[in-house]
Every structure is written in C-alpha cells, then in structure tokens.
Amino acid sequence: RGFAKLPNDMFAVSEIGRISIFDSNLKQVNTLKHDFFGFLHTIILSAGREKMLVVSGGYDSIFEVDIKTGAIKWSWFGWDHGYNPRQQDGAFLTYDRRQAETWQRQGKKAEFVAPQLYGKQGLVTAGRTTFPNSAYYNIYKDESTIVATLFHDGEIIEIDRETGDVCVRLSGMNIPHSILPLGDGWLVTSTREGCFFTLSPT
C-alpha cells in the first residue's frame, strides 16, 4: 500500500506486516519489522530522508522508523490519546497488560492487545478504535506535528509529536484517505463520498 523512494536509488514498499527495502536492481536488501506493524498503509520520508512515518492501521498506531536500523524513533497509539473505547462493543484497548487488568477491576470491559495473537493483519477492521490509514510530516511546521486520516472517525487530525495530543482539523468525512501536501496546504479524499477537500496549512 505504501511506496517511498530512498537515498542511493533504493526504495521501500510497505507490505501487510513489514517494510521491504530494495536496491535499484530490485534486489531486496533489508526488511524492517515490529511487533505492532499490522495492516500497514502509507510510508512517508522525513525531510532529512533518514526516517519514515509508517501507518499501522491494524493496531491503531503510527511509527517513525530509522530507515537504516529499523529502530523506532517515535510512536503514537490512538488508544492512549482519546480514541478509546472501541465503538463496536465499548471495550477499552491497550498494549499494556497491567492497564487492561486495572480497567477490568474497575468494571470496565478491556482488552489486552498482544500482537502475537493477531499477527500481521492486526485487529479486524471493526475491532479497531481509529484505523489510521495515512499520515504525513507537517512540512508547514518543521515536522513538529504529524497530520493523519482516521478511517473510523472520519477525521483529519494533527498530532503534537512531543505530547501525542490531538487537534481535529476536519471531521464528518466518510472514510478519508491519502492526506498529501498540495500547494501551500493539504489535499485529502473522502472516499465513500467520491470527493476531495483542500485544507489550509494551519
């Protein structure tokens, strides 16, 4: 679903649960993996071309990955930043077993999400709380924030990289996808409506 041209005539392709790196001769030279890589979507390079944003829709998350080492430099889970509980059944999701147990003691329905149980697809579509499906470094703010589309919520959000806090830039969309810079702003599709929107940079 994702493709990015890398330095030295290499390129990256996001598969379901991993990112494959190829050289100019189409030889696979590296594979980047993480437990919470699931149902991957877009991959976008940073301005310095040393890192990339990886959208893991299957686990309601976005990662920044070092291209050479595969190390995670930054991460964001919707579950930690207001996108909980799940609409389907009211269950609170977490990657922290102790947090799940605490919620359960409080009488809440909670699910400890262990990637070993769900694999490279992650949670099923209806089992996700947000389902981010595209993200981009905010080039208008020196990449200090990330803009992203949320499938379930129909939102365009801006994420503060320091805190993970979210500002909703646009809501009420019907399955938004593919936020990209356009001119001095942003272009995004509202897929089910068959239309697109342009947004100001701030």
Please place each PLM-identified region on the residue numbering.
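Short loop/turn positions that demarcate and connect the beta-strands within blades
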Residues: 35-38, 127-129, 172-174
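Surface-exposed loop and turn segments in beta-propeller and other repeat-based domains
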Residues: 1, 33, 73-130, 202
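Structural signal for beta-propeller blades
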Residues: 19-21, 60-63, 154-157, 194-197
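Short loop/turn segments that connect beta-strands within beta-propeller blades
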Residues: 23-27, 66-70, 160-164, 200-201
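Conserved beta-strand positions in repeat-built beta-propeller and related beta-rich domains
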Residues: 6, 12-16, 54-59, 147-152, ...
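Loop/turn-rich, solvent-exposed surfaces of beta-rich toroidal or solenoidal domains
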Residues: 1, 6, 178-202
